Amino acid sequence: MLSNQPHKSVLLDEVIHNLNIKGDGNYLDLTVGFGGHSQHILEQLTTGTLTGNDMDKDSITFCTELFKDKKNVVLVHDNFANFFNHLKQLKVTKFDGILIDLGVSSYQLDKPERGFSFKHAGPFDMRMHQSDRVPTALDILERLSEEELTHVLKKFGEIAHPKPIAKALKTLINNTKNPTTVEVAETVKAAASNFEKYKSRNYLAKVFQAIRIYLNRELESLEIVLQHIPKLLNNKGRFLVIVFHSLEEKLVRNYIFKLTHFVQPPELPVKLTPPFELITKKPILPTEQEIKTNPRVRSAKLFVIEKK
């Protein structure tokens, strides 16, 4: 059994405040993780319900135990892109608030065997969904050509000079059986050594980010789930999403703009209004105090919109 609350919830107070929770409302946490946000949502419910979704088996196992005495909680184990497919089995199909937290949990980062971190030696895995049918990060490095890997690093890590990194990683894979996360990290650092300003930890993090995003199809999944949000929300229901890097942010900003802005065609006699409105004109950022206690939240941004 996992230890209690192995992950600190990001922007917790801001999320709970902006969900505008009603005691009899129905709420959906599409990235329930280890139940941090969801626990606080539940505290404000009387006759309302909470539905939690996560693709991480450890998270669902933890939350099943955490919420075992809660009759108003339902958990779904799947990629949130597939959540819409589960509606037929659920009693609640429309929600008063939906939350997506796109961050990788501290538990995933700190557990070496999950392979997300370059701080600890472990298998180069990085799977959010630990199914045998899902390839690992190591599988991806083996399958992709040097040219394809270069493209992945540039597109999903926004990495300058990705070619020598890709070349070095392919050489590592060809010459080393089952290299660890630390060996992958050392290879990246060595390949980047000719580019003085790219020796930083941030550069290494971007390489790991690129492979993780590609492996787990994160941006593709985000695009799919965003298409379903308007259909899942009740009128006056709110959608909250926390992003952590520029690729997510760009996708979310474009999505929100389309839902909250409408160009009135001059030939239409009836004035049309967009289906959603912005609750916060600018994204909500972590406080200095939160960043001090949990440095991993420093890049987090919370967007909030409401269905009219």
From Swiss-Prot:
It is an enzyme of class 2 (transferase). It holds the Pfam family Methyltransf_5. GO terms for biological process: rRNA base methylation. Keywords: Cytoplasm, Methyltransferase, rRNA processing, S-adenosyl-L-methionine, Transferase. Its main location: cytoplasm. GO terms for molecular function: rRNA (cytosine-N4-)-methyltransferase activity. One of its GO terms (cellular component) is cytoplasm. S-adenosyl-L-methionine binds at residues 35-37, 54, 80, 101, 108. It is found in: Cytoplasm. It comes from the Bacteria. The keyword Protein transport does not apply. Its EC number is 2.1.1.199. Disulfide bonds: none annotated. It catalyses: cytidine(1402) in 16S rRNA + S-adenosyl-L-methionine = N(4)-methylcytidine(1402) in 16S rRNA + S-adenosyl-L-homocysteine + H(+). Belongs to the methyltransferase superfamily. RsmH family. Specifically methylates the N4 position of cytidine in position 1402 (C1402) of 16S rRNA. This is Ribosomal RNA small subunit methyltransferase H. The gene is rsmH.
